[in-house]
UniProtKB/Swiss-Prot annotation:
SUPFAM superfamilies the UniProt entry points to: TPR-like (SSF48452)
Any one GO molecular function term: snoRNA binding
Protein name: U3 small nucleolar RNA-associated protein 6 homolog
Designated gene of the protein: utp6
InterPro entries reported for this sequence: HAT, TPR-like_helical_dom_sf, Utp6, UTP6_C, UTP6_N
Keywords: Nucleus, Repeat, rRNA processing
Gene Ontology CC: Pwp2p-containing subcomplex of 90S preribosome; small-subunit processome
Record's subcellular location: Nucleus, Nucleolus
Organism: Dictyostelium discoideum (Social amoeba)
Family to which the UniProt record says this protein belongs: Belongs to the UTP6 family.
């Protein structure tokens, strides 16, 4: 409690000065001190948490804003006495970071407050302490470099800090990106004739962030890497402005070093450099140099992507997106053609279905930006999509999913005849594909008149006969499931049977169950699941036939594996007779049969009671 009282006494002295200045009243002073006493007790408690400090700091920062606002109204906004709450908040941050030295967020909050609201005095020392505690924090290294670059106006110290951060965080991409951005920002400031104070580099500069990097490397077991070094001519703003380096060669050095690092073979890592460079396209551009720093850097970045990622889908998609977004080419049609050339080049090199999907997705996205009246452009896009699919078929690139999407596209474009032809080709190529057979059968059902015309022209092609297709699908898909015992494969086959069953019920007036059920029993292993789905489907139909449902239950229970073990089937059958059919006598008979047939009838008996 003595520590609390001592702290309160010191705070009261400073707060009383605000009363004498007329910033707050005596009653407000009492209320503030009472609130502070509450917070002081919380933070001096042995079991205090970080949240206790942050709540107290938040209160002090709110007081600082209030005092500053009232001081401004009295034209005394720059009086040092007004900043007592801010000074106290900074002291509280110091206590919090001392108690929780490994808390990254706490350090960053403390440093941001110092940089935004306080003077820079002592901030460099605080950065040194923070980095010594958390040398693996990329965020802290970036913030430290920002402080040296933007506050201290010391580009060389900023370079050294960001490179030290890279050494301690070799897999962090953001540090390399920040280094690149910082160098481009620096030359942008110089090129724009913005006054940038270029202090003389001195080892004993008072507010610079000083770190014993050798000691820190040793404690963190980090191997020493040589920093990128720069000649004296670029340490002087005046000399740099007159140099060819103003056109991005410093950033170029950073990029080349970055792609040689352990993370340099990451496509997206390199791609981000291109995006950063796009903000500095015209830096260094003049009558003698038609390309600015950003343009030159982008050119090199693209060359590196093409050279090092020649078989990566992302390379050609990215190059195509650049062509598509070029503002220098006003014609959307020309941009589309240029993008398509790049995408086609990628297709001939990569020859994979995944690349084709990316290609198609890219082209489809363009449609979103097109006005409906631009029919010519839409026709061009349609032609591009169809040619890409045709090339893929001719070169055996298309797999099951590819055919499925191609058929959907043809239907979307109103090319039903072509869709039916391609669908036939697909099931011949991929005989064991549930998805393609389902697609084929649905096509036949929905386009019966077209199919009949095809049938007359093709001498009764069995692939145009719905029943034949179902039978071929059932046989082919079931034979594949016997070799592939996964639950997914079995479920897919079962679903195919269900679709066939629905078709028989809806479209076949004679409802020839015997034919279809015989086929199921012969080919399908998990009959319980199949019958349950069929029964559920029949029970939910508006025009349900009770005898048909009974027939399915009886077929299901004729299988010993089901009748001796599956309690649910017996119970569902009994409840069906009781609730849907209203036949109590039959329901009781089924219950009795269940008790006799089940190996363990107790679960059924407990449900019947």
């Amino acid at each position: 409690m003595d520590r609390v009282n001592f702290s309160i006494d010191q705070l009261l002295e400073e707060t009383s000065k605000l009363v004498s200045l007329g910033i707050i009243s005596k009653q407000e002073c009492k209320d503030i001190m009472k609130k502070r006493e509450y917070h002081e007790i919380k933070i001096f408690n042995r079991n205090s948490h970080k949240s206790d400090f942050l709540t107290y700091i938040k209160y002090e920062l709110e007081l600082d804003r209030l005092f500053h606002k009232r001081g401004k109204a009295k034209n005394i906004e720059f009086d040092y006495r007004l900043r007592s709450a801010l000074r106290h908040a900074i002291i509280l941050f110091g206590s919090a970071t001392k108690k929780f030295p490994k808390d990254e967020a706490l350090w960053i909050n403390a440093l941001n407050i110092r940089m935004k609201r306080a003077s820079k005095e002592g901030t460099g020392r605080l950065f040194s302490i923070a980095l010594s505690n958390l040398p693996r924090s990329a965020k802290l290294w970036k913030l430290a470099a920002t402080f040296e670059f933007e506050v201290n106006k010391n580009i060389q110290n900023a370079r050294n800090l960001i490179q030290a951060g890279i050494q301690f965080n070799k897999t962090d991409k953001s540090l390399w990106h920040y280094f690149f951005l910082m160098e481009l920002t620096y030359i942008s400031l110089l090129f724009s004739d913005i006054t940038f104070i270029d202090k003389k580099i001195e080892e004993e500069e008072e507010e610079a962030i000083k770190l014993n990097l050798d000691s820190l490397r040793k404690s963190e077991k980090i191997e020493k890497d040589e920093f990128i070094t720069f000649g004296k001519e670029i340490l002087s703003a005046d000399k740099l402005k007159q140099s060819s380096l103003i056109r991005g060669q410093i950033a170029q050095i950073v990029f080349r070093k970055a792609i040689k690092s352990s993370i340099g073979q990451d496509f997206d890592f390199r791609k981000h450099f291109y995006k950063i460079a796009s903000k500095f396209l015209d830096i260094g551009k003049d009558s003698e140099n038609p390309m600015g720093a950003g343009e030159l850097l982008q050119k090199e970045i693209l060359e590196s992507l093409v050279t090092d990622f020649p078989n990566d889908d992302k390379t050609y998609i990215f190059l195509a997106s650049i062509e598509q977004s070029k503002s220098s080419e006003p014609s959307l049609l020309k941009r589309l053609n240029n993008s398509t050339k790049i995408l086609n080049q990628g297709l001939t090199i990569i020859k994979s279905e995944s690349y084709l999907f990316n290609y198609i997705h890219f082209i489809r996205q363009i449609i979103v930006d097109i006005k409906l009246k631009e029919n010519k452009l839409i026709e061009n896009i349609t032609d591009i999509l169809l040619k890409a699919y045709k090339y893929s078929i001719d070169n055996n690139i298309l797999k099951e999913s590819g055919y499925q999407y191609y058929i959907e596209l043809l239907l979307e474009l109103g090319k039903t005849n072509d869709a039916i032809k391609v669908s036939e080709e697909s099931v011949k190529l991929f005989k064991n594909s549930n998805q393609l057979w389902n697609q084929r059968i649905n096509l036949l059902i929905k386009n019966e008149m077209v199919v009949k015309l095809f049938d007359n022209l093709s001498n009764n092609n069995e692939y145009n006969n719905i029943d034949k297709c179902f039978e071929m699908a059932v046989k082919n898909c079931t034979s594949s499931t016997t070799s592939t015992t996964s639950s997914t494969s079995t479920s897919s086959s079962s679903n195919l049977f269900i679709e066939y069953f629905k078709y028989q019920v809806v479209f076949k007036f004679d409802k020839d169950y015997k034919k279809i059920v015989d086929l199921f029993e012969k080919l399908l292993k998990q009959l319980d699941e199949f019958y349950q789905k069929c029964i559920l489907y029949e029970e939910e139909r508006i025009e349900k036939n009770i005898n048909d449902i009974r027939s399915l239950y009886e077929k299901c229970l004729s299988i010993k594996e089901i009748s001796s073990k599956d309690v649910d089937v017996w119970l569902n059958y009994r409840n069906f007779e009781l609730k849907s059919a209203g036949d109590i006598e039959r329901a009781n008979t089924i219950a009795t049969r269940g008790k006799k047939s089940l190996a363990d009838p107790l679960p059924l008996l407990s449900q019947l009671q």
